[in-house]
Structure formats: structure tokens, C-alpha cells
Amino acid sequence: MPAELLLLLIVAFASPSCQVLSSLRMAAILDDQTVCGRGERLALALAREQINGIIEVPAKARVEVDIFELQRDSQYETTDTMCQILPKGVVSVLGPSSSPASASTVSHICGEKEIPHIKVGPEETPRLQYLRFASVSLYPSNEDVSLAVSRILKSFNYPSASLICAKAECLLRLEELVRGFLISKETLSVRMLDDSRDPTPLLKEIRDDKVSTIIIDANASISHLILRKASELGMTSAFYKYILTTMDFPILHLDGIVEDSSNILGFSMFNTSHPFYPEFVRSLNMSWRENCEASTYLGPALSAALMFDAVHVVVSAVRELNRSQEIGVKPLACTSANIWPHGTSLMNYLRMVEYDGLTGRVEFNSKGQRTNYTLRILEKSRQGHREIGVWYSNRTLAMNATTLDINLSQTLANKTLVVTTILENPYVMRRPNFQALSGNERFEGFCVDMLRELAELLRFRYRLRLVEDGLYGAPEPNGSWTGMVGELINRKADLAVAAFTITAEREKVIDFSKPFMTLGISILYRVHMGRKPGYFSFLDPFSPAVWLFMLLAYLAVSCVLFLAARLSPYEWYNPHPCLRARPHILENQYTLGNSLWFPVGGFMQQGSEIMPRALSTRCVSGVWWAFTLIIISSYTANLAAFLTVQRMEVPVESADDLADQTNIEYGTIHAGSTMTFFQNSRYQTYQRMWNYMQSKQPSVFVKSTEEGIARVLNSRYAFLLESTMNEYHRRLNCNLTQIGGLLDTKGYGIGMPLGSPFRDEITLAILQLQENNRLEILKRKWWEGGRCPKEEDHRAKGLGMENIGGIFIVLICGLIIAVFVAVMEFIWSTRRSAESEEVSVCQEMLQELRHAVSCRKTSRSRRRRRPGGPSRALLSLRAVREMRLSNGKLYSAGAGGDAGSAHGGPQRLLDDPGPPSGARPAAPTPCTHVRVCQECRRIQALRASGAGAPPRGLGVPAEATSPPRPRPGPAGPRELAEHE
């Protein structure tokens, strides 16, 4: 400003009623008494020093600002303060900034004395009737603030909202906003803070009304209190939108209160591009650190910047006025009617001021209201505050391209969502080492993997936490909801990701995405599976008692068969009737060993070489064969069932069977969708089931699926639950089975608060995961791998060693016993042969063992040692004739031995002395028995050949002096024939 112009300011009028303007004096009324306050004192000092430093004038013409403190907002104290200001001869009064009632009193007194009043606070309401001499206001008018809020609501398409008022006159201040809701017929609920200044009840009402847009009309301190309480109630999530009318929004410290995903909008008038703005902020910061080290400096308050601009505006107006006339000051008093004669002129010049200050462009209309200014729209972000748009005083709203939008992909990107869930296998489970982990890493499961896929697809972050009461959600008698539904309604969570069933009743209070899994209600019950198959499972078809009785029956049949064969004369017969020499020798094939072996062959269905002859033995055999036929058939039929399919005994087969009986209890999860299904069902069977479950004591409802499974396994209890969880638990426990089919059809979805802007985007993401088969892959990951096979797989399964390994053990044991018996027989036979042949046992054993292990020899000669004493008598013809037949081969009964003792079978030996040794036997008669055995035919053929020479070694006298010949082997058929 030119020095010559300011020199005019210090020239006093010659009028006798005015004093010479020795200095440009102003009065500032401050209603903030704290040193660490809004910085208004410092702002006034900065403005004064800046003006006085630029203008080189004498000290008596310098700008002076007298500060008066207002202790409380009262008309009496304000009037008293004004009475102290008037005698000082001020050209203008500034403030107060935060006391509309006091500001109204100051305006009234200044109007009476015609002293310009510069308002730096909100406009009083109701506005005083327009006077001839009025004040000017640097603060935005109520109409402008109301219009700005209304335009923001329309821009973001917020149909309904709730207004929290700190004072009753807020409806008048926001008259344009209320009028806009009335015209659009949208809902605007208004709630007033009481004298306690506790916003908690109001916030709870808003939460219960499911309103997501909240407008707060209060100063900075009360707005901060409301947001802090909202954070405690979980109402600062991404689903809530806050719009604050205070112009001190930039200095609100919200980082420790709200979340990163919160949507909080406010206004700012600061012109950050002003050349003096950095110096202004730095000076306030330095002053704050010198005087207020205990608290954090949050930034400059709007009232401080308005005080700074007010000083410059008054100086500019006085400068313009001084160009046209000389002005002077006049001391005034409250008790006199005198006025300042230059006040009206200065007021007119004030309305014509155009100034670019710290709060932007400063201009006034004819009513003294600020015009041609802008309001910066800020959004709270992780980096502080982000400008998302500008509102112009000509009622124009310009939003930036990076602003919030209803486009879901933009709102979800880089957001941190609170996700509530509940522990339910296999959807959400704790990891085995969850205590050593933190955050989302503590959990695993199908829903956890699906949420991770969604977060990667939509680029948002999330924080998993368990629902406080451990319930899915059901309505209470008072209208509230429990569980995850209640947390979504109360906006404590942004999403609910779990085995969350979509129901019509829940859809009324919350939103759901499209189902990510389709299922239905099923019945889970336990079955008796019997013991686990073992190596001796082939014994399972019969009980131990049956096996015992079968053994006793076998022994009884063997004994009866032995006795019947011994008693019946038809079982005694001559085995070789063609040998006429001893016709009275009879045999019985049913020895004790054969009697024990014959039932075994029949039982094993392999037969035996022993055939019954008598009617009694045939009767015993037939009865035993009939017995074994039934036993073997029954065993074969039961063996397949026992080794391939375990027995399952289920007393009920459907929901109707379950409802018609009372022996088996049944229930659902408490406060779950299944319980709600039966509660609201109109089907008669389900109504009866609900009446039973509701009236049954003790309660049949359980708190979790694990508790229901344990109750099923430990008692007669049927559990009603979703089919997917039914399938999962059946795979883990083979003693569980599903009864009947599905009772209904429904789906699992992701829950969100009502009106959530994320619904469409999450639904599209779920559909994309289904199309990519990602959800099916996740299901196979968490459902497969159980201990029990699928019940739908009816293909025949091969039997393993655990089923039939016992029969191999029996076979091995039988082979070991057979080898042991063979060894014992070998030792016993070798020992007897050694005694008869008069050789050592070891020599005989080695000789016999050499023949036994020879692979090429299939026959051998019976070795006989020639005795060292007198020569034995030659084998007589009678001995040859008494040779017995066994299995179609001829064996010698031994020289000098008894024929009856030579063969192993029982026989009847009648005393039949043979013919004299010298007599020639008579010619044999042909064999006349009905059935001629093979050996008889061979003997007849030998006789018919007519060979009369005696065989070698037969008929030679014992006294012969010829050298001894080697021991002959067994006599062949031809030798026998020649001997005869």
C-alpha cells in the first residue's frame, strides 16, 4: 500500500465531535480463553505485524487490535464487554467466533452505534430481521452450507439420511437440506443431542433404523465426540457415510478413532495456495510448541484464519474510504445515543471489498454475506485428508475423478473390511498352531480360502474375527438379532463369511450375495457298524456257539459212523474175493481214522474214496451231507455280506418316521437357519417336529455342530443340519449316516449390512469363481480325504488281507502241521526199518532221505538185509496167495508172517490150513463175483498165460550151496502168476 495513502488515515477530522485518527484501532472479542486454543490471538498478531511491517508509517498510525475475552456465552457479559469497547474509539469489532448468541448481541449493539461488525463464526439462527446497518460475515452462510450438503447427498445417491443436531436451531440452519428431502419424499430422520451431550443413544437408534448416511451439525469438539462414540459402537465401517458441517474438519484428529475404510466427508475454506499460508501455519506451529508442548498441534483453526482475513479486510475498507473522505474516531458509550458518523460509509466500503485471503476469495453481497468463494470437500484417508471435490457459492458442485463413487470396484479397492465368522468345520477352522499365529493366519477352511480369492480378485484387505456370541443369528422377542446377523445390523462388521444360510427372514434385515453353495437340510444319525474287519473275519458269519456246535456235530457223526460200520455186517467184506486161498478174511473200511476223515471230506464238499455200503452208514452219510449243504450255503451267503458290507441298522428311514416316534430325540443348532426353517414351516410333519423340539426337556438344541455330532454318537439322537456338513462329518466318522433325502433346498451366501454398496461386486466375483471352477476345487480340497468312502460309490471293492488274511494263517498252520507229521512218520518208519534190517538209525535215515529227495526216481525197491544165520525158508505158494492188495498194487505180506497181520485194515481170520507143501494146488476157477476189480483181471490174465516156471528166488531150497543172490525187490505180477 502506498505510504501516502496511509498517511491520510492518521489525519484527524476537524470536526469537533471526532478525535484525530491517531491509529487504526480494532477490537477483537475472543471466546476461547485457553492459551493452546484455536490460535486466534496469534493470528491477530500476525496480521497486525504483517500490515505494520509492510507500511512504513509512524508508530502512532500503526494498526492496533485490542483483545477482549468473553468468559461465557451470555447476553449480559457480551453487553458488558461491548460497553468496555465503545469508549476506546474502534473502527470495527471482530468476533466472537464460536458463540452465535454473543455474536448476535455484538451485531445488535454495533448496529445501534453504527460500528462495523465482522463476523467470523456461524450465522446466528434465527437470523435477525434485516436492519439498515448490518454486519458482514466471513463465515459461510447457513444457506450455502445446507445447499452444499444437499448436493453431496445427491451426487453420491444417498436416498436416506439421519441428521444429528447439537442445537435445536440446526433445522433452521439447514433449511435448504430439509426442504430438499421434503420435495424428493426421501427419509431424513432428525435427532437432537440432550444436555448430557452423550450421542450414544442417538447412534444406537440410527443403527437400529439401518441408516447408513449420517449428517453431523456440530462444532469440531462435539463432532469429534460423536465420531468417537460411533467408533465404539462399530459404526465407522465402510458402510457408514458421515458428512460434517463444521468448517474445522481438517483439524479433527480421527486416525485413532475411525478405520481406514471409513467414509467421512467435511469442508475446508483454507486457500492453501496463498503465499502467506505456509508462514501462517509455521508460525502457529512454533507458537503451539512453545506454549502447548503437552498436546499435539493439529493445524490451524478456521477462526484464526478468518481473524487474519478480517483484519486485512477492515484495513482495505478503511483505505478505500480514506480516499474519499477523512475519517476520525469517536469514543462512544452504552449510556448515550451517539453513533460513529463514519460507520455507515465504512460498512458500504466493506461490502465492496475484494480480497484474496487465507480463506479464499473474500466478497460480500448486499446482505453482508460472503459470496464468490469455494468450499473444498475433503475425505478422511490413510494419508490424512484428500480433496475429492469443490463446492462453489454459485451452487455448483465439481467432483474429482478420484472421488468416492457408488462403483463398487472403486469403493472396495484398498479398503480394509471387518469380516465376522464362526467356527464350523470345514468352512472356518483354527489351525493346529493358531496360538503361535496372529491375524488372518490363525484360520483355515473353505470360507477362508474363498475369502482370500475374493480379496485378490477385488483388491481389498480384510480382518477376520469370530462372532462374539458364537451364533449365526436369530431374532429376539424385542426385535433385535443375535449372532452374525446382529453384528451386521449393528454395523460391527462389513461382511459375514461362513456357512451362512440365506433365508427370507434374514433378507429383511441384511443383504446377501448370490449363493456360493447349494444345499438342503438333512438328518444325521449313527449306525452300528460292528467291529473292524480282522484277519479272522471269515469266522464272522457264524457265532462262536455255532462253530462249537458244528465241531461237536462233527465228532458225533464220526463216532456214530464208526459204531454203525462196526455193527453192520454189510460193512465187513472180502477185499479180494478172487484169492481163494483165504476166503474167510473180511475187512472194514471204517477204521477210526477213516471215520474221522469221511465227515471232513463231506463237509469240505470234496468227497472221499470211502463209500458206505450198509444202509445205516448211508443214512448217517446222507444226513451229514444235508447238514453240510445248509451250513455251507448259509456260510457262503453271510461271508460276502460280512467281508464286503458292514451291517447298518437304522431304526428310521425318513423325516416322517422320525416324527412318528419318540424313542429317538432330534434337534438342530440353536438360533440357526435350520431351527428357523422348522419354526416357520407350515408343513404338518415339520410342525409336529418343531412342537416336539420346542417342548422337549432337556433341550434338544445344541450350540454348535461339534456338540450335535457328539450327541449323535453318544446317545439316541438325530441331528438336523445342512447336507454339506452332513457329508463332511460322514466322511470323518464311518458310524454316521444320512437318513432320507433333503428336507428343503437353500444356499450359503455372504452376508452384508442392508443397503451395502458391495453387494453387486461381491456377487459378480462369486459368479466368476463358480465359472472358473474355483469353488468346486476348494470343495474337493476340504471335503475329500476322509476315512470313509462315498456312500454313492456302489462298485464292488476287492477284499484285502485285513478281511481274509486269517484263512492264509490257517493254511500256513495246516502246512506246518502236515510237514511236522511227515517228519515224525519218517523218523518212526526209519527207526523200525533200522531195527528190522539190523543197521544203524542214522545210516537207514540217510539212505531213505537220499531216495526221498531224488527228483528223478519215482519208484524204489524195498531193501532186505540177508541174515547172517541159517538161511530162511523160501516163500511158500501159500504166502504168495495171501498177499493183500492195496490201491491196485501188490505187496508181499512177508515170509513166515501171518497174512492177517500184514495188512492194515481190520479183518476176520478163520483158521484155514493150507494144502501140503508138496501137493499141487487145484486149478483155480474163474472169478464169479459181480464186479471184477482191476487186480483180479490182471491175475486172471497172468493165469491164462500158462507160464509154469517158478519165479526166480522162489522154490529154491534153503540148503542150496549156490552163492547168495541179492535181495529181491517186491514181487511183480508176473512172478506171482508163475509161482501159482
From Swiss-Prot:
Region described as Disordered: 891-927, 944-980
Residues exposed to the Extracellular side: 15-544, 644-803
Glycan attachment positions: 219, 271, 285, 322, 372, 394, 400, 407, 414, 478, 735
GO biological process terms on file: excitatory postsynaptic potential; modulation of chemical synaptic transmission; regulation of synaptic vesicle fusion to presynaptic active zone membrane; synaptic transmission, glutamatergic
Segments crossing the lipid bilayer: 545-565, 623-643, 804-824
Membrane protein topology class: Multi-pass membrane protein
Pfam families: ANF_receptor, Lig_chan, Lig_chan-Glu_bd
Annotated Gly residues bias: 894-903
Single Gene Ontology MF annotation: kainate selective glutamate receptor activity
Secretion signal span: 1-14
Keywords annotated in UniProt: Cell membrane, Cell projection, Disulfide bond, Glycoprotein, Ion channel, Ion transport, Ligand-gated ion channel, Membrane, Postsynaptic cell membrane, Receptor, Signal, Synapse, Transmembrane, Transmembrane helix, Transport
Cross-referenced SUPFAM superfamilies: Periplasmic binding protein-like I (SSF53822), Periplasmic binding protein-like II (SSF53850)
UniProt keyword Heme, yes or no: no
Any Gene Ontology CC annotation: plasma membrane
Disulphide connectivity of cysteines: 36-292, 83-334, 165-170
Gene3D superfamilies from the UniProt entry: 3.40.50.2300, Periplasmic binding protein-like II
InterPro entries in UniProt: ANF_lig-bd_rcpt, Glu/Gly-bd, Iono_Glu_rcpt_met, Ionotropic_Glu_rcpt, Iontro_rcpt_C, Peripla_BP_I
Places the protein is found: Cell membrane; Postsynaptic cell membrane; Presynaptic cell membrane
Chain's role: Ionotropic glutamate receptor that functions as a cation-permeable ligand-gated ion channel, gated by L-glutamate and the glutamatergic agonist kainic acid. Cannot form functional channels on its own and produces channel activity only in heteromeric assembly with GRIK1 and GRIK2 subunits. Can form functional heteromeric receptors with GRIK3.
Record family assignment: Belongs to the glutamate-gated ion channel (TC 1.A.10.1) family. GRIK5 subfamily.
Subunit relationships: Homotetramer. Heterotetramer with GRIK2. Can form functional heteromeric receptors with GRIK1 and GRIK2. Can form functional heteromeric receptors with GRIK3.
Name of the featured protein: Glutamate receptor ionotropic, kainate 5
Provenance organism: Homo sapiens (Human)
